[in-house]
Regions:
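Extracellular Cys-Trp
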Residues: 80-98, 161, 171-309
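Disulfide-bonded cysteine-rich modules in secreted/extracellular proteins
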Residues: 101-114, 206-211
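Bacterial flagellar/type III secretion structural subunits and associated motility module proteins
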Residues: 112-124, 185-205, 214, 313-337
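Second-shell loop/turn segments in exported
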Residues: 129-137, 225, 396-400
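Structured, hydrophobic secondary-structure cores that serve as assembly/anchoring elements
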Residues: 1-89, 303-433
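Conserved short hydrophobic interaction patches
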Residues: 145, 149-153, 238, 242, ...
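Extended, beta-strand-rich, solvent-exposed assembly scaffolds of outer structural proteins
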Residues: 60-66, 111-181
């Protein structure tokens, strides 16, 4: 047997000649790149041409409108994601509404006669829809025009009704319809209004089947618009299964919430997963899915798994009223309960500190081991770096006593390079570079 192992030159050749092969197993000396692939699970409309439960890679929100329906939550989540990261590697899998689901509804009733020209504006889920008002127009006339404008807009509701009443119905069934904020402004037109918030939505779609369809592919970030207990549990179970020591396709899940601190921390306490992070934007008018989509896109843009995400802006979210801004005690409590606060700084919505929902060990002991979401992302990257180095260096080597020191050497080299990457960053930061 030859002392040098060849992959393509048999050792039994007796014909004289010069036989040369290339071996690139030792070519890679550095650490692997860390591009982030994002999977978005989102509700679609029947008008969409993409079959439900079939993932598709997207590059613009215009594609999402065609594939999943204009004004669907999938469409608007894709728009929000690309607004925060135009270079996003995004795959979307659309899901149909639950067969037992109920659509949320809201009403806006105008009254009076316009005494001056102006604009009536309605904001639905953070999207503004407006119509001009002329002097002398009745409330019913303006309401009809407003319904037409809403129907034509990229919003997650439809408009109907008679007379001066406008009935808004969520396009998607489930509790997600209740998350649409609703505000109305009649300006100085002389018209008045009465508005009732979205209520009645029940039974969100189930993401478990959609996740099972993509279980064999590696996505680094999975974004879900549903923050209800059942779907959060399904997301947690899926991520645990694909990220374990056998499958080794490490990923994190991203959720969003706009509820009160008490409601949000109760939800994260039930999740308690070091691989799931939930952005909390108190009092937001956007649905939770829009918050999650922007947060996931910002996470994906930061390829350094250990770099903190503090102060990064999430675009596309309306600035909440001052009364909704959380106090220091609320933010601190949120961070102690697995909730990532989003705060308004200089008229921009920013991440305060990105944490996971994990706070308690299996025996209910306080455990900050996976506090920051960067911790599990870093561990995933270290595992992948070691695994890829071994796979590159020793793809078909026989397990022997001579091989083990080589494997150890390669692993140590990877770990040293990882440490050097952190040390170099620290030295540059200390030098003000």
């Amino acid at each position: 047997m030859p002392h040098i192992d060849f992959d393509t030159i048999p050792g039994s050749i007796r014909v004289p000649g010069q036989y040369i092969e290339f071996n690139t197993r030792n070519a890679v000396q550095g650490l692997p790149q860390n591009p982030q692939k994002v999977l978005m699970v989102a509700p679609m409309l029947t008008a969409g041409i993409q079959p439900a439960l079939e993932p598709v890679q997207l590059f613009s929100d215009a594609e999402a409108a065609d594939l999943f329906g204009q004004g669907s939550l999938a469409h608007l989540m894709v728009r929000q994601a690309f607004a925060n990261n135009p270079y996003l590697d995004l795959t979307v899998i659309g899901i149909a509404d639950h067969s037992a689901g109920v659509q949320a509804t809201a009403t806006v009733t105008l009254s009076g006669t316009a005494t001056a020209p102006g604009v009536v504006e309605i904001t639905i889920g953070g999207k503004q829809v407006s119509t001009a008002v002329n002097t002398g127009e009745t409330a019913a006339t303006v309401a009809d025009r407003l319904k037409t404008a809403i129907t034509a807009a990229d919003v997650t509701v439809t408009a109907s009704g008679s007379g001066a009443a406008v009935t808004l119905t969520a396009k998607h069934k489930g509790e997600i319809g209740n998350e649409n904020g609703l505000t109305v402004s009649t300006g100085n037109t002389g018209l008045t209004y009465q508005a009732n918030a979205f209520t009645g939505g029940a039974k969100n779609a189930d993401i478990a089947t959609a996740l099972s369809k993509v279980a064999g592919k590696h996505y680094h970030i999975i974004c879900s618009p549903f923050s209800d207990d059942a779907n959060a549990k399904a997301l947690s179970n899926h991520i645990t299964n694909v990220s374990n020591a056998i499958e080794q396709r490490g990923c994190i899940g991203v959720l969003g919430m706009s509820a009160s601190l008490s409601t949000a921390t109760t939800a994260t306490g039930k999740i308690n997963d070091g691989r799931i992070t939930c952005a909390w934007y108190k009092g937001a008018v956007e649905p939770n899915g829009i918050i999650a989509a922007g947060y996931a896109a910002v996470l994906a843009f930061e390829e350094d798994p250990a770099k903190p995400l503090n102060t990064l802006e999430i675009k596309g979210l309306a600035v909440t009223p001052d009364a909704q801004w959380p106090l220091f005690a609320e933010c601190n409590n949120a961070l102690y309960n697995g909730l990532t606060p989003l705060t308004v700084v200089n008229n921009r919505v920013q991440i305060m500190r990105a944490v996971s929902t994990y706070t308690k060990s299996a025996n209910n002991t306080d455990d900050p081991a996976l506090l920051d979401i960067t911790t599990i992302r870093t561990l995933d990257y270290v595992r992948r770096s070691v695994k890829e180095r071994i796979a590159l260096r020793f793809p078909r080597d026989k397990l022997s006593d001579r091989l083990l020191p080589k494997v150890k050497s390669e692993i140590l080299d990877v770990l040293i390079k990882l440490d050097q990457a952190v040390s170099t960053h620290s030295r540059l930061k200390a030098a003000g570079i």
